[in-house]
Amino acid sequence: MNRITETFARLRSSGRIALMPYLTVGFPERESTLELVPALEAAGASLFELGIPFSDPLADGATIQRATQRALENGVTIADCITTVAQLRARNVKAPLLLMGYYNPLLRYGLERACAELAAAGGDGWIIPDLPLEEAAELRPIAAAHHLDLIMFIAPTTPPTRITQIVAHASGFLYIVSLTGVTGARQTLAANLADLITTVRQQTDLPLVVGFGISQPSHVAEVARLADGAIVGSALIDRLERLAPSERVSGATAYIRELVSATERVH
């Protein structure tokens, strides 16, 4: 049983869903990720999505685009992101760590090299929003050979036949996109989210983790009625952007603790 599977099994038995923060590696400062992840894990975060900075982040809204630009200005590369994973393991972080990035930079870096290095660093998988199912055929076996999960996306616009195909090739968990459009904090989640999750649940036992638009404890509580985890990204990045440097870790920790308080399963 790998780290991701173990994490969801443990949460299920304790009656909670996962809270998964997204952090852009090297934002706000180059070393920030090394300070934030251990603190947020201690606050109750269960898994981490660590973003590789890229100059053309298609799926991301303005908040994460700004964070990405800052990380690029800080000189952060794919190799640095993999090193960050190893450094977090050296700091005794136990939670699953997944790198989120876009496919072209990964392809240029080398799929075999990237997977071998991430596995050796103690990483658990990849989240690649611009990689459609058909094109994932090259990366999937390489990732699997290194015991890394390749996380697949299902959106409100994904047709039922396509959901069946995606589920057949998925591992780790499924990333359920709660809204159409780019990432960013919203006031409400999609009205048809429950229907989408019901459709996917009929086809798989994999954990379902909801992302895009989650910013409040009420959103997490809503997800806890439906799914197995909630991802918070833009709302966390937004706080880190606004907080004074001396208050970033404590402010982010307080926010994550508030969201974790809403993770009790109610279905």
UniProtKB/Swiss-Prot annotation:
Keyword Nucleus on entry: no
EC number(s) from the headed UniProt entry: 4.2.1.20
Positions annotated as active site in the UniProt record: E49, D60
InterPro entries reported for this sequence: Aldolase_TIM (IPR013785), RibuloseP-bd_barrel (IPR011060), Trp_synthase_suA (IPR002028)
Any one GO molecular function term: tryptophan synthase activity
Pfam families: Trp_syntA
Catalytic activity entry: (1S,2R)-1-C-(indol-3-yl)glycerol 3-phosphate + L-serine = D-glyceraldehyde 3-phosphate + L-tryptophan + H2O
Pathway(s) it belongs to: Amino-acid biosynthesis; L-tryptophan biosynthesis; L-tryptophan from chorismate: step 5/5
Keywords: Amino-acid biosynthesis, Aromatic amino acid biosynthesis, Lyase, Tryptophan biosynthesis
Gene3D superfamilies: Aldolase class I
GO cellular component: cytosol
Family per similarity comment: Belongs to the TrpA family.
Oligomeric and partner information: Tetramer of two alpha and two beta chains.
The protein's role, per its UniProt record: The alpha subunit is responsible for the aldol cleavage of indoleglycerol phosphate to indole and glyceraldehyde 3-phosphate.
Protein known as: Tryptophan synthase alpha chain
